[in-house]
Amino acid sequence: MVDKTSDSGRCPAVVLAGGRSSRMGSPKAAVLLGGQTMLDRVIERLSPQVASIAVNLNAHSGGALPSGHPAIADTIPGLPGPLAGVLAAMRHARQVAPGASHVLTVPIDAPFFPGTLAARLQGALIVGDEIAVAWSLGEMHPLFALWPLAIADDLDSWIRTDEKRRVRAFIARHASVAVDFPVVATKAGPLDPFLNVNTPQQLEEAEEWLNRLEDSAI
């Protein structure tokens, strides 16, 4: 295991909240879950795990930004997709954390992600220049990832030249390591910690899961 994420041992992180939220019908960053905005909930969960948190927001993203967490916009105009947020995260991390080799990204729409996310992704680095990606139940969660800053220029070129700009396809271009996370035990059965909340219906389901979670479950 190689830990070269930062001088302090903790990596910088960026919450990806710059999407259109078209399926939700309103900005996901400002949507309430359990009386908290999704953005507040994600930041609260992420804060103990990382050295710093910025939020990738664009003009349409909405939501009040918690104090102490800078907003960063895509560096490539035209909303070219989530990889633009990853690139913005890499560029920001290079500026604010000169000793860091990686940046962690977390999407706004999965509020139950593990409290061990950052530590386990960091611990999975072998050579030190891989992308560490979260998995659960046999599925990749490509935006829950630890990205090496050294591949920022390649990502910039990929976004500008590849028509589809698929996150999984970009990951396949580089060395990566998969980190599998178990389901969470709840009173209502197992919960995928990367449960996605993209629609009003999924938000209702997330509220139900929140009510069922055992105090020690996550």
Curated annotation (Swiss-Prot):
Residues that bind GTP: 16-18, 28, 56, 74, 109
GO biological process annotation, one example: bis(molybdopterin guanine dinucleotide)molybdenum biosynthetic process
Assembly and interaction partners: Monomer.
Binding sites annotated in the UniProt record for Mg(2+): 109
Reactions listed under catalytic activity: Mo-molybdopterin + GTP + H(+) = Mo-molybdopterin guanine dinucleotide + diphosphate
CDD domains assigned: MobA (cd02503)
Protein name according to UniProt: Molybdenum cofactor guanylyltransferase
Protein purpose: Transfers a GMP moiety from GTP to Mo-molybdopterin (Mo-MPT) cofactor (Moco or molybdenum cofactor) to form Mo-molybdopterin guanine dinucleotide (Mo-MGD) cofactor.
InterPro entries documented for this protein: MobA-like_NTP_Trfase, Molybde_CF_guanTrfase, Nucleotide-diphossugar_trans
Free-text comment on this protein's domains from its UniProt entry: The N-terminal domain determines nucleotide recognition and specific binding, while the C-terminal domain determines the specific binding to the target protein.
Organism per entry: Sinorhizobium fredii (strain NBRC 101917 / NGR234)
Similarity field: Belongs to the MobA family.
Example of a GO MF term: molybdenum cofactor guanylyltransferase activity
Gene label: mobA
